[in-house]
């Protein structure tokens, strides 16, 4: 059976999946479970790997395993979507009301370019209504 549901996951949700699922909404958890049950249903942007690595190297999160092992786990559990020129162009064109953080912009633009919904707790992203979100 082919992939029938693909959902883009924001960086903080990746961290919460690994360490603190109680932070996630019931709807987010249910959507993640559904996507996993239907095949390769969870995706991340390349930039999420950079963000997780940066958080770990700065001591903001404790991985409990080597960064390399954690990143291998991420790559095994998620479809990793590359940062494309189309996504960059889309991110640059976002209105000023969208979060300014370049990673947030790339993740949101990736969702739009790929036609995916984004699981995120980020209120600014959700309020923008620019990207289809699940929370």
Residue positions per predicted region:
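ABC-type ATPase nucleotide-binding domain
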Residues: 55
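Alpha-helix capping/helix-boundary segments
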Residues: 13, 48-49, 87, 107, ...
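Phosphate-binding/catalytic loops
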Residues: 92, 129, 134
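Phosphate/NTP-binding elements of NTP-utilizing enzymes
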Residues: 52
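Short acidic-hydrophobic, aromatic-tinged amphipathic segments that line or gate anion-handling sites
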Residues: 81-82, 133-135
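Active-site neighborhoods of divalent-metal-dependent phosphate/nucleic-acid chemistry enzymes
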Residues: 64, 75-121
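Short, well-structured N-terminal submotif of metal-dependent ribonuclease cores
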Residues: 1-44, 58-72, 114, 124, ...
């Amino acid at each position: 059976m082919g992939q029938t549901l693909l959902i883009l996951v924001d960086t903080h949700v990746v961290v919460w999946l690994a360490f603190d699922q109680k932070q996630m909404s019931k709807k987010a958890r249910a959507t993640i479970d559904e996507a996993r049950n239907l095949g390769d249903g969870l995706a991340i942007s390349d930039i999420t790997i950079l963000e997780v690595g940066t958080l770990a190297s700065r001591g903001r999160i404790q991985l409990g395993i080597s960064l390399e092992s954690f990143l291998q786990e991420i790559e095994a559990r998620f479809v990793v979507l590359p940062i494309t020129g189309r996504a960059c162009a889309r991110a640059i064109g976002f209105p000023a009301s969208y979060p300014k953080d370049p990673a947030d912009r790339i993740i949101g633009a990736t969702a739009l370019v790929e036609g995916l919904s984004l699981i995120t707790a980020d209120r600014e992203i959700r309020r923008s209504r620019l990207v289809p979100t699940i929370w």
